[in-house]
């Protein structure tokens, strides 16, 4: 975990004044490494001793030592792009880094994933009267993918990327409904409120999120993904891939739990979709001509 990621992970545990320092640094880490302690205190509207207390809470000896660690973190990645990519990387270099990072992260998540949580989630999903998938930002795309998969399972499925419709759906939940909320940071206020609304209306809430987050704490069941990617600083890449893969795991578990007869229904759905596609054999014949 680099210094930027460490600051982000500790935000909730900082005092109000120390958090002001953290937010100034996260907003402009490049400026922070060139700032004096007096300038930092002035910008954060705190005292210089507060800046030093913040630095010590980050396991550094003071502001100069903190700036050194911060500079090293910035050298290890390009903010708002990817933690593994540097400004001067060639196309061959950054292409390889992105693929290697994705494969390594998925392998790490595979080994760290709580299989009992997966099993419990499959239990809840297979018993659900209605399933809703919600996310915001990049996680909305993952929720949409989940809707596409579970829509084939002959169970009522709800999806929306509009927060008003999401809130209305959670307010209309009832016993037997399951709401799946997806957020890498687990700190999106709207999603935490959705979890509260759904539970107040007797629904079960499954969260795909990071451990120890407000969303994880509010959910009935949290499937925590250990992905070392700070999406406040970098573009979400591997975290989204991990979420998509876990959705595939849940869909597979759902299918297996429902049994062979249920898979016959999936076969009929696949057959019905064939008419919407060009026939591969006809396309091959056309190519031969």
Swiss-Prot record:
State the InterPro entries in the record.
Answer: Homeodomain-like_sf, HTH_RpiR, RpiR-like, RpiR-like_SIS, SIS_dom, SIS_dom_sf, WH-like_DNA-bd_sf
A single MF term (Gene Ontology): DNA-binding transcription factor activity
Asked if the Swiss-Prot or TrEMBL record annotates the protein with the keyword Repressor, the reply is yes
Q: Which cysteines are joined by disulfide bonds?
A: none
- Where does the signal peptide begin and end? none
Q: Does the keyword Protease apply?
A: no
Give all residue intervals belonging to the HTH rpiR-type domain. Answer: 1-77
Residues in the DNA-binding region are: 37-56
Keywords, comma-separated and alphabetical: DNA-binding, Repressor, Transcription, Transcription regulation
Q: Which residues form the SIS domain?
A: 121-260
Query: Which Gene Ontology BP terms does the record give?
Result: carbohydrate derivative metabolic process; DNA damage response; regulation of DNA-templated transcription
Q: Which domain of life is it from?
A: Bacteria
| Gene3D superfamilies named in the record | Glucose-6-phosphate isomerase like protein, domain 1, Winged helix-like DNA-binding domain superfamily/Winged helix DNA-binding domain
- Role summary: Represses the expression of the hex regulon (zwf, eda, glp and gap).
Q: What is this protein called?
A: HTH-type transcriptional regulator HexR
Q: Which gene encodes it?
A: hexR
């Amino acid at each position: 975990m680099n210094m930027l990621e460490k600051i982000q992970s500790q935000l909730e545990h900082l005092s109000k004044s120390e958090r002001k320092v953290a937010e100034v640094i996260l907003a402009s880490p490049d400026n922070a490494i060139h700032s004096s302690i007096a300038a930092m205190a002035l910008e954060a509207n705190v005292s210089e001793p507060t800046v030093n207390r913040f630095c010590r809470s980050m396991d550094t000896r003071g502001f100069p030592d903190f700036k050194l660690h911060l500079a090293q973190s910035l050298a290890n990645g390009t903010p708002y792009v990817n933690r593994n990519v540097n400004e001067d990387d060639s196309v061959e270099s950054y292409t390889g880094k992105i693929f290697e990072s994705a494969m390594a992260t998925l392998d790490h998540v595979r080994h760290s994933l709580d299989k009992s949580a997966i099993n419990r989630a499959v239990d809840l999903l297979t018993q659900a009267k209605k399933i809703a998938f919600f996310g915001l930002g990049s996680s909305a795309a993952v929720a949409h993918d989940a809707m596409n998969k579970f829509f084939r399972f002959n169970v009522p499925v709800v999806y929306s990327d509009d927060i008003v419709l999401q809130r209305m759906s959670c307010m209309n939940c009832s016993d037997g409904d399951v709401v799946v909320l997806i957020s890498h940071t687990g700190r999106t206020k709207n999603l935490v409120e959705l979890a509260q609304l759904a539970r107040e209306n007797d629904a079960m809430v499954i969260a795909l999120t990071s451990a120890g987050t407000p969303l994880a704490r509010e959910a009935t069941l949290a499937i925590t993904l250990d992905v070392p990617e700070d999406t406040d600083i970098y573009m979400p890449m591997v975290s989204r891939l991990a979420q998509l893969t876990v959705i595939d795991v849940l869909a597979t578990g759902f299918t297996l739990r429902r049994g062979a007869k249920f898979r016959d229904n999936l076969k009929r759905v696949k057959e019905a979709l064939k008419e919407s596609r060009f026939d591969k054999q006809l396309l091959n014949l056309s190519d031969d001509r």
